[in-house]
Amino acid sequence: MTIAEHDNVFIFVPNLIGYARIVLALIAFWFMSTNYVISGWCYVTSALLDAVDGQAARAFNQSTRFGAMLDQLTDRCGTTGLLVTLAYFYPRYMFWFQLSIAIDVACHWLFMQTSVVVGRSSHKVNDNFIMRLYYQKDILTFMCCVNELFYVCLYLLHFTYGPLIFGASLFKILAFLTGPFAVLKALISVMHAYVAGIDLAAVDVRERQERRQKSEPVSGKKVE
C-alpha cells in the first residue's frame, strides 16, 4: 500500500519529535549511572518535549493514534528506566520503586487498551468525572511535571545536593514538596485501571448478551 506524503503518519512533525524523545531517553539511560549531567539534561529534555509534540499535533492538525501510542510508550519506558536506576541507587526502597513501575505500566496499558476496544477517539476522552478533570490540559501538565521532578530530584541527590537554600539542599526540598503529588499520581493511575476495568467488563457483558441472542431460536419458528 502506497502512502501519500501528506498521510504518512511516520513523518508527521509530532512523531518526529517523538523519535527525538526516544533517542534522548536512550542517551539518558546510557549515562544514568555514571554521568548525571548528561543523563539529567537528556532525560529532562525528553520529558519536556512531551508537551511540545502535543502542541505540534494540534498546530499542524497531525493528531494520530500512532502518535498517541508512541507518546504513551515513550513516557512509560522513560519513567521505568529512571525508576530502575533509583531502585539500584536506593536498594532500601526498591519495593516502592518496583511498585511504582508496576502501577504506572499496568494501569496505563489497561486504560489505553480499553480506549481502543471501546472505540474512543482518544484515551483522554472519558465519561468518568475524575478522568475528565485529570485530563484537563493544565492539571495533566502539572501532575506530570511534578511527578517527573520528584524522581529526577531523587536521582540527582544520589550524586549531589545541588544549590543550598538557607543551608538546605534545593533538590531535597523539591523532593519533599513534589513527593505527595507523585503518590497522588500513582493513586490516579490506579483509578485509571478501575475505570478501564468497569468499561471493559461492560463490553464483555454486551458481547455475551449479543452471543446469547444469536444462539437463541427465533420466536415463532419451529426448532428442528
Curated annotation (Swiss-Prot):
In adults, expression is higher in the head than in the body (at protein level). The keyword Lipid metabolism applies. Keywords: Cell membrane, Lipid biosynthesis, Lipid metabolism, Magnesium, Manganese, Membrane, Metal-binding, Phospholipid biosynthesis, Phospholipid metabolism, Transferase, Transmembrane, Transmembrane helix. The active site is at 75 (proton acceptor). Residues 30-35, 98, 160-163 are lumenal. Mg(2+) 2 binds at residues 50, 71, 75. GO terms for biological process: basement membrane organization; phosphatidylinositol biosynthetic process; phototransduction. A CDP-1,2-diacyl-sn-glycerol binds at residues 54, 58, 64. Its cofactor is Mn(2+); Mg(2+). Residues 1-8, 53-76, 120-138, 185-224 are cytoplasmic. It catalyses: a CDP-1,2-diacyl-sn-glycerol + myo-inositol = a 1,2-diacyl-sn-glycero-3-phospho-(1D-myo-inositol) + CMP + H(+). Its EC number is 2.7.8.11. GO terms for cellular component: apical plasma membrane; Golgi apparatus; lateral plasma membrane. Disruption phenotype: Embryonic lethal. In follicle cells, abnormal apical accumulation of the basal membrane (BM) proteins trol and vkg. Decreased expression of strat in follicle epithelial cells. RNAi-mediated knockdown in both larval salivary glands and fat body, results in small salivary glands that accumulate lipid droplets. This is likely due to the observed decrease in PtdIns levels that would lead to low insulin pathway activity and defective cell growth. RNAi-mediated knockdown in the fat body also results in a decrease in PtdIns levels in the fat body and a decrease in fat body size. One of its GO terms (molecular function) is CDP-diacylglycerol-inositol 3-phosphatidyltransferase activity. It is a multi-pass membrane protein. It comes from the Eukaryota. InterPro entries: CDP-OH_P_trans (IPR000462), CDP-OH_PTrfase_TM_dom (IPR043130), CDP_ALCOHOL_P_TRANSF_CS (IPR048254), CDP_diag_ino_3_P_euk (IPR014387). Although Mn(2+) can act as a cofactor, it is much less effective than Mg(2+). Catalyzes the biosynthesis of phosphatidylinositol (PtdIns) as well as PtdIns:inositol exchange reaction. May thus act to reduce an excessive cellular PtdIns content. The exchange activity is due to the reverse reaction of PtdIns synthase and is dependent on CMP, which is tightly bound to the enzyme. Required for the regeneration of the signaling molecule phosphatidylinositol 4,5-bisphosphate (PtdInsP2) from phosphatidic acid (PA) and maintenance of its steady supply during signaling, thus playing an essential role during phospholipase C-mediated transduction. Belongs to the CDP-alcohol phosphatidyltransferase class-I family. This is CDP-diacylglycerol--inositol 3-phosphatidyltransferase. It comes from Drosophila melanogaster. The gene is Pis.
